[in-house]
């Protein structure tokens, strides 16, 4: 499928965005742009600045990389707008109405709110343009930890204990007894461990809620789960097959300043190591892969997801699902599939073709 003069499929790589994961999105986009097969795909870069302006994107993937702990950002350039008219689907126009480019498929490499949460998926659904990855429902539910866990629990999947704070800052005594200490206080709709605190004494709880509320008015408080951190990727092929990657075991995640896997630990400090495949027994590996696929289906995901677990003495417990996981050079999702025999370039090809197949 292509309408381009080159005969190639035109992929609009949309990245950046208004979320606190803006820079991670930029690095993911740079890696994707560098690995899309140039024999099959023409890349149309579209950036979204931190204040929400849609602009002509960076054409050089090398400029969207992490250099000396400096994360890239979308620069202010000439603005463009996506068409919402199905008769002009895939078109991006300059402010004067002239055409910037026409895409056959959208690859929304957006992490966090205003991108991974169903908003952009809904925007492009208005014009009937195919989009890589899950649709509106799965994206929205996957971003909101409250509803992720409600859907997983409804399917009988193993989850931890949590309490939601909407318009209050305190826990009741019953809730404190339910959760115990330590607890993790998180923005309910966030990622990359931004705004998260590990609380070991209740007198520190209000400060942690304030930090989380700086990123989301809704806060989730979770019991600490003691166990190994394991991740598993899920990939859907154009023919509908859903497969799980080999899992990855993360080590060193407690090295962050707060005693957990925080933003700097994930992307900057280079202290976390991953064993891929995870050194787990066959039964546990198969259970994690099965639970990952069940989680994918519970949220009605399409295309891809990364599912995060704690493996405890009593078995795996689901932590969260990422409907647009990181694609940076150090991200677990592409690394797990590479170890499963699906190279980065092939992984991207499957994802784009799956989106196009859904459209057909």
UniProtKB/Swiss-Prot annotation:
Its cofactor is Mg(2+); Mn(2+). It catalyses: 2 D-alanine + ATP = D-alanyl-D-alanine + ADP + phosphate + H(+). GO terms for biological process: cell wall organization; peptidoglycan biosynthetic process; regulation of cell shape. InterPro entries: ATP-grasp, ATP_grasp_subdomain_1, D-Ala_lig_Van_CS, D_ala_D_ala, Dala_Dala_lig_C, Dala_Dala_lig_N, PreATP-grasp_dom_sf. Residues 149-353 form the ATP-grasp domain. Mg(2+) 2 binds at residues 320, 322. Transmembrane segments: none annotated. Gene3D superfamilies: 3.40.50.20, ATP-grasp fold, A domain, ATP-grasp fold, B domain. Its EC number is 6.3.2.4. Binds 2 magnesium or manganese ions per subunit. Keywords: ATP-binding, Cell shape, Cell wall biogenesis/degradation, Cytoplasm, Ligase, Magnesium, Manganese, Metal-binding, Nucleotide-binding, Peptidoglycan synthesis. ATP binds at residues 176-231. It is found in: Cytoplasm. It is an enzyme of class 6 (ligase). Its main location: cytoplasm. GO terms for molecular function: ATP binding; D-alanine-D-alanine ligase activity; metal ion binding. Mg(2+) 1 binds at residues 308, 320. Pathway: Cell wall biogenesis; peptidoglycan biosynthesis. It holds the Pfam family Dala_Dala_lig_N. One of its GO terms (cellular component) is cytosol. Belongs to the D-alanine--D-alanine ligase family. Cell wall formation. This is D-alanine--D-alanine ligase.
